[in-house]
Amino acid sequence: MTNTTSNEIKQLDSDYIAQTYGRFNLVLSHGKGCQVWDFEGNEYLDFTSGIGVNSLGWTDEDWLKAVVHQASSLAHTSNLFFTEPSSRLAKKLAEVSGLKRVFFANSGAEANEGAIKTARKYSHDKYGKDRATVLTLVNSFHGRTISTLSATGQEVFHQHFFPFTKGFDHTPANELRALETRLGQKDVCAIILEVVQGEGGVCSLDHEYLQGVQALCHQYDVLLIIDEVQTGIGRTGTMFAYQQFGLTPDIITLAKGLGGGLPIGAFVLGEKVQDTLGKSDHGSTFGANPVSCAGANAVLAKIDDTFLAEVKRKGEKLQKALAALPKVKSVSGLGLMIGVEFEEGTKAADIVAKCIEKGVLFLTAKTKLRLLPPLIINDEQIEKGIAVLKEVLEA
């Protein structure tokens, strides 16, 4: 395999992998910190972190040590046995969230599915079967399974896959009156929302709206589920984004940055629903995988108050620098989860392609440029990324 060329890998992909991804024209070989290299030895500064997954960058030494040690001793057991990594990880997640119990899955979509099941069972146990609707927000994204796609509030994803799962409805973001009117129908068991809508264009919800949502949830005994798949684990400058808005969710969902590069998802249950799921109500063969949990424990061990303060500082620095660039109309987001809207005529996808040619990797979200750098990115790397972006925008 060491003599394989980029073109050979691309051809194998074309021949044998389902063509569901619009890939960058790069074949990556290895990475370290905030840099990655392709098969030809070209170096790139990474502002994508695997779409917010590599929170500690590429091949962090402590993370790698924990993962290799666990893989060499106990890689998989199923959930018929107790394991140390999952137990310790669950305790840590309960402590940092203020919630009570954790169910481990393998992805954000799985975590959201589990949260939805929990909400419906809670409502069924308390009110009966006619109170099962889950509300989500217009412009939201919650996954690509049939149920989480049904929950997603973007028509662009609602093509070709009919019929969708019943029991979901969408309400406009930042419109409390519309939400209260919908809750008045008395058929809703939960609302699930992202504090910052990532795939929807890095759009932050209003503080007043979020406070109002929480109050309405209390009034109608509707569960508040916060999707922290992209915003969680330090991405926004606090461990979880909801902590910046004075919210107390009943359930949060996690994935992406939790594993530091390995697949893992989780939903964390608050006191009201901590005992809702009983034996055989939910399950996952690969959930709580010891290796993934060991990686997640290594990630959480590094995210302390000092680390989070640096994420916030670097995010503010990056947003300020981005706002000063030519052709930039607006900058949105929290911490190191940032969206850049360009003036009319400047396409984010074109900017990303030109930046790749100059050795810097960015993402898009709808029509915006999206930045999700490793949380360990330093000031010099931020300045380099801004310089390249400025050069491209001025060309």
Give residue spans per PLM region.
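Conserved N-terminal phosphate-binding loop of PLP-dependent enzymes in the Aspartate aminotransferase
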Residues: 2-395
